Amino acid sequence: RQDISVVGIAGPGDPMCDADKTLETFRLVKKDFSHVMLCLSSNGLAVPDYVNDIADLGITHVTITANAIDPEIAKNVYSMVRYEGNIYKGIDGARILLERQAESIRKLKEKNIIVKINTVVVPDVNMDHVPAIAKQAEAWGVDLMNCIAMIPVHDTVFENHRGPTSEEIDNMRQFIGHYVPQMTHCKRCRADAIGRLCEA
């Protein structure tokens, strides 16, 4: 399709868990479609180790999913973190993830890469914490923030947890918009989506 101007890798899973294949895919895309914009989405755990590669490949936009900046809150969002061959649970895993996310964002901004953070908003878990995330995002120099409503999914920890209403998300975006610009056109694309936003 001639109307495709962006190629992004977002999953399923975290693309940087298999960084070699992800980066090679970007290399191949850049080789044959040099005009397209390259975007990467990640939880940030492995990103610090590959920031130079990301910059060298001309990946201009990176999204980091940041659902908390406080480990006490993050431990209620993430059941475990697998890092350097070990599994960490609870506060230990949360601390590692948040430290790596912060390092990712700082290093990406040092390379002048556009950084967006995605925050999945979960009532009674991190919703009241979102303004603090936005304030920290401003301090990091994040370019854009996307507040995403959590959708309960069967057989997951939040399957019986309500998601935020559209009004709650809209109010949140208005409340924190003075910290960092808010993305409002997200269509929650599948990882294998192809086409325009209006086709999502």
Feature locations, PLM:
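Contiguous N-terminal and early-domain "leader" segments and peripheral loops that mark the onset or edge
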Residues: D3, T65-N67, N171
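Short Fe-S-cluster ligation motifs
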Residues: R1-P12
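A structural signal for short coil/turn segments at secondary-structure junctions
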Residues: R1-Q2, F33, N112, V180
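Short, well-ordered beta-to-alpha junction loops that form the rim of enzyme active sites
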Residues: P12, V120-V121, A191
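Auxiliary Fe-S-binding modules of radical SAM enzymes
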Residues: P131-A200
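Conserved AdoMet/S-adenosylmethionine-binding subsite of the radical SAM
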Residues: M16-I148
